[in-house]
């Protein structure tokens, strides 16, 4: 009888330890409801494109793209290397985007992050730009550039990565995007962006983030029937891959 009780107690303790370890290792977003991105503007009437189909794909594999009226293919690559204290993480994405009205556009996005690691602490080394997307259709070209965030001289914990993005359109106009770090109903700012807002002359025209429980690319209703809607969509697509790739793999 005593042996049976001891055996049951052992199994009980092992079960408790298992669930405790599981709770500790599973990210918070897997256990609790994920709040929507706080865009600071009303996007309730925006056109949305669900980005779920862009997840869970193998590296180097060419994947089919189907988002609303858009079709095409995309291929995403992530690689890292390290020598002594110096490390490097590279990402690149090739996208062929086909739309009945706007034709075929080719997008190539790439980024590189250089790191210096000592005593188990990793420090990013500043680049002139962190990420760039070239978008071409014949002689038409648009360019998206993600600038490095301003690193504080001293920070307790991870700093908030406030990102500025420059987007040059084929006609020479320049629009911008800014990173978003707050979620609806919460005051705390997340270190990594939880979305981006695309802005033209101070007015939000699109973005990426979480809206109504879905991760989406957003196009403001006021530009939905204009050529700018297509350019905002491509910019959002480039930013989605930047945000997706700007996460260190647990295998690094």
Task: Mark where each language-model region is.
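Intrinsically disordered, glycine-rich low-complexity segments
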Residues: 1-5
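Bacterial N-terminal signal peptides
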Residues: 15-27
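Intrinsically disordered, low-complexity proline/glycine-rich segments
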Residues: 30-252
């Amino acid at each position: 009888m005593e042996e049976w009780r001891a055996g049951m107690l052992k199994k009980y303790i092992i079960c408790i330890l298992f669930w405790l370890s599981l709770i500790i290792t599973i990210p918070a977003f897997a256990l609790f409801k994920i709040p929507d991105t706080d865009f600071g503007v009303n996007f309730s009437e925006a056109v949305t494109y669900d980005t779920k189909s862009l997840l869970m794909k193998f590296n180097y594999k060419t994947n089919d793209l189907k988002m609303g009226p858009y079709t095409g293919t995309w291929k995403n690559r992530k690689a890292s290397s390290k020598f002594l204290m110096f490390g490097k993480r590279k990402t690149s994405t090739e996208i062929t985007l086909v739309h009945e009205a706007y034709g075929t556009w080719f997008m190539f996005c790439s980024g590189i992050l250089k790191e210096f690691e000592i005593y188990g602490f990793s420090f990013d080394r500043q680049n002139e730009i962190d990420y760039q997307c070239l978008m071409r259709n014949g002689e038409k070209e648009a360019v998206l550039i993600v600038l490095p965030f301003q690193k504080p001289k001293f920070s307790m914990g991870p700093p908030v990565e406030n990102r500025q993005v420059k987007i040059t359109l084929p006609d020479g106009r320049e629009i911008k995007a800014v990173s978003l770090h707050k979620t609806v109903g919460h005051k705390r700012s997340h270190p990594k962006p939880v979305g981006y807002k695309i802005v033209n002359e101070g007015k939000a025209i699109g973005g990426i983030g979480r809206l109504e429980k879905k991760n989406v690319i957003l196009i403001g209703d006021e530009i939905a029937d204009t050529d700018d809607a297509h350019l905002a969509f491509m910019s959002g697509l480039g930013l989605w891959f930047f945000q997706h790739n700007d996460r260190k793999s647990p295998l690094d």
